[in-house]
């Protein structure tokens, strides 16, 4: 309607000129038709129409629950029961009939519940799918259930899910709290925020256009990335760390472990590590246009150069040095930004 409305109005105006001899009733009909078209064109500003959906499914405590949504937010909470409670609201600012173009399906299998948002073709939409309808989900699952979330446009918030968790959206924020088996948290356009997360194996979190923040994170391996946004981590413990950032600062506050490997790459942004009593590390740091500073006494070229190495480390743009027993490996590269290794 956005593209066709001007042509419809122009056609009506031309018809009015050529039919100047017609009576007033016909002119009124044309006027009403134009007004109706304008109202349809501005339908997005109409009052919101809603339709509610509710469903409860009995499952085992270790069930798997997946939710696939097109547009709308998803909120999932781990509960104490043995059922999946699904509350959903369809929303549109178009005609109420558009709500029927979107269907919510719930498939039950042995130990598994699959929830999907599906579009249906409707004559009133001339074959288009119900893209103007969003669906917001509020779901409670057994705390030990595993959860898999996917959405095209909408934010996700997950709290208290103790089973494995994967949450991915194209446009929207991803927020998790108290999720000890988090595996994946990703957004293309939106922030990713993790609190009290952990993983038995590797954990991956990333955003293309947004920041990644984490607090109280525990994992064997962390893979984090952002194209345009900061990566800020506090109270973090891991054996392996890989961070890639194109445009944004990186801050890591936490522990490094004996034998651990930690690699941070940033094209345009500063990197700051704040470490709590590290046993030791071997450092390789490079910055094309920035300084490198360490609060730890680094050894560059041998014990006798300890003090001199520390001073030089603050000015050099590329250093290889050791602190303590040198058991961990720390590699930091940034093209444009400072590198700071601070004591906590």
Stretches found by the model and what they are:
Residues 1-344:
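Intrinsically disordered, low-complexity terminal regions
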